[in-house]
Amino acid sequence: MLTLTRIRTVSYEVRSTFLFISVLEFAVGFLTNAFVFLVNFWDVVKRQPLSNSDCVLLCLSISRLFLHGLLFLSAIQLTHFQKLSEPLNHSYQAIIMLWMIANQANLWLAACLSLLYCSKLIRFSHTFLICLASWVSRKISQMLLGIILCSCICTVLCVWCFFSRPHFTVTTVLFMNNNTRLNWQIKDLNLFYSFLFCYLWSVPPFLLFLVSSGMLTVSLGRHMRTMKVYIRDSRDPSLEAHIKALKSLVSFFCFFVISSCAAFISVPLLILWRDKIGVMVCVGIMAACPSGHAAVLISGNAKLRRAVTTILLWAQSSLKVRADHKADSRTPC
């Protein structure tokens, strides 16, 4: 257990503002990712074949719906149940662990999407790379099942690491600038060890994502040089596909790094320094990142854009019909 001589309190106004922002982020994130899920799932209901990228987007939207739900539960825990003067309760620790696992599955899916973009857009000249790209295109469903299996294995290992590690106490003495002496008694760092384990387990998919994204960037550079020499038309479908894919991957990289840094900072803020305001800021950042990438995916996917246009036209026609009906009812006979 951690005992500090000074504990920062959080006012009711701050907690209410944070909860309002959390509800808003949950609503936006749920709507955007539910939209991606429903558009692709509707094709499954109609028994239309899904492309490989649509299958990945379907799984990605499910994982992000789970992420948003966990972050919203974390916000409720912070504002109503988790006290600064007490150690982390088991429910909040469980939420953090589940978020780490869901975030790791999200990273594996993004790496899978990056590999898929490489196999579809890059023109390989080496025989091995051509066979590898063809294998990725054929085995995308098996890769998705493998991601689910890896997530389950990670869940079991994290639970085992969390509950099997023995309890211990570490006392640390810190001298502040005003010569204030703080005795830190840190007990049961199992959550932090599980957190580090999940981050280490995320290194392989992150490296895979970086390598495939780098290959796509190099391919885009080569394609643009080829266009300058041989092609005069600025509208090239291959170039547009490269740019859209890179926008999606670069935006995911930025959002993932920001979200991971916020998550990593939030753990010592709450365990060591009991800075609930800092944790609230980190949770808000973590909740905003999946919504931002979902918006980028919708803007870069033709099928999703058509669905958005259809919904907007339907809403506009419905409002027009309702307005005409009200105008007719007010007109005297």
From Swiss-Prot:
<feature type="transmembrane region" description="Helical; Name=3">
    <location>
        <begin position="95"/>
        <end position="115"/>
    </location>
</feature>
<dbReference type="GO" id="GO:0001580">
    <property type="term" value="P:detection of chemical stimulus involved in sensory perception of bitter taste"/>
</dbReference>
<dbReference type="GO" id="GO:0004930">
    <property type="term" value="F:G protein-coupled receptor activity"/>
</dbReference>
<comment type="function">
    <text>Receptor that may play a role in the perception of bitterness and is gustducin-linked. May play a role in sensing the chemical composition of the gastrointestinal content. The activity of this receptor may stimulate alpha gustducin, mediate PLC-beta-2 activation and lead to the gating of TRPM5.</text>
</comment>
<feature type="transmembrane region" description="Helical; Name=7">
    <location>
        <begin position="277"/>
        <end position="297"/>
    </location>
</feature>
<feature type="topological domain" description="Cytoplasmic">
    <location>
        <begin position="212"/>
        <end position="251"/>
    </location>
</feature>
<keyword id="KW-0297">G-protein coupled receptor</keyword>
<feature type="transmembrane region" description="Helical; Name=6">
    <location>
        <begin position="252"/>
        <end position="272"/>
    </location>
</feature>
<keyword id="KW-0325">Glycoprotein</keyword>
<feature type="transmembrane region" description="Helical; Name=4">
    <location>
        <begin position="143"/>
        <end position="163"/>
    </location>
</feature>
<keyword id="KW-0812">Transmembrane</keyword>
<feature type="topological domain" description="Cytoplasmic">
    <location>
        <begin position="39"/>
        <end position="55"/>
    </location>
</feature>
<dbReference type="InterPro" id="IPR030050">
    <property type="entry name" value="TAS2R38"/>
</dbReference>
<dbReference type="InterPro" id="IPR007960">
    <property type="entry name" value="TAS2R"/>
</dbReference>
<feature type="glycosylation site" description="N-linked (GlcNAc...) asparagine">
    <location>
        <position position="178"/>
    </location>
</feature>
<feature type="topological domain" description="Extracellular">
    <location>
        <begin position="164"/>
        <end position="190"/>
    </location>
</feature>
<keyword id="KW-0919">Taste</keyword>
<feature type="topological domain" description="Extracellular">
    <location>
        <begin position="1"/>
        <end position="17"/>
    </location>
</feature>
<keyword id="KW-0716">Sensory transduction</keyword>
<protein>
    <recommendedName>
        <fullName>Taste receptor type 2 member 38</fullName>
    </recommendedName>
</protein>
<comment type="similarity">
    <text>Belongs to the G-protein coupled receptor T2R family.</text>
</comment>
<dbReference type="GO" id="GO:0016020">
    <property type="term" value="C:membrane"/>
</dbReference>
<feature type="topological domain" description="Cytoplasmic">
    <location>
        <begin position="116"/>
        <end position="142"/>
    </location>
</feature>
<feature type="transmembrane region" description="Helical; Name=5">
    <location>
        <begin position="191"/>
        <end position="211"/>
    </location>
</feature>
<feature type="topological domain" description="Extracellular">
    <location>
        <begin position="77"/>
        <end position="94"/>
    </location>
</feature>
<feature type="transmembrane region" description="Helical; Name=2">
    <location>
        <begin position="56"/>
        <end position="76"/>
    </location>
</feature>
<feature type="topological domain" description="Extracellular">
    <location>
        <begin position="273"/>
        <end position="276"/>
    </location>
</feature>
<keyword id="KW-0472">Membrane</keyword>
<feature type="topological domain" description="Cytoplasmic">
    <location>
        <begin position="298"/>
        <end position="333"/>
    </location>
</feature>
<dbReference type="Pfam" id="PF05296">
    <property type="entry name" value="TAS2R"/>
</dbReference>
<keyword id="KW-0675">Receptor</keyword>
<keyword id="KW-0807">Transducer</keyword>
<dbReference type="GO" id="GO:0033038">
    <property type="term" value="F:bitter taste receptor activity"/>
</dbReference>
<dbReference type="GO" id="GO:0005886">
    <property type="term" value="C:plasma membrane"/>
</dbReference>
<feature type="transmembrane region" description="Helical; Name=1">
    <location>
        <begin position="18"/>
        <end position="38"/>
    </location>
</feature>
<keyword id="KW-1133">Transmembrane helix</keyword>
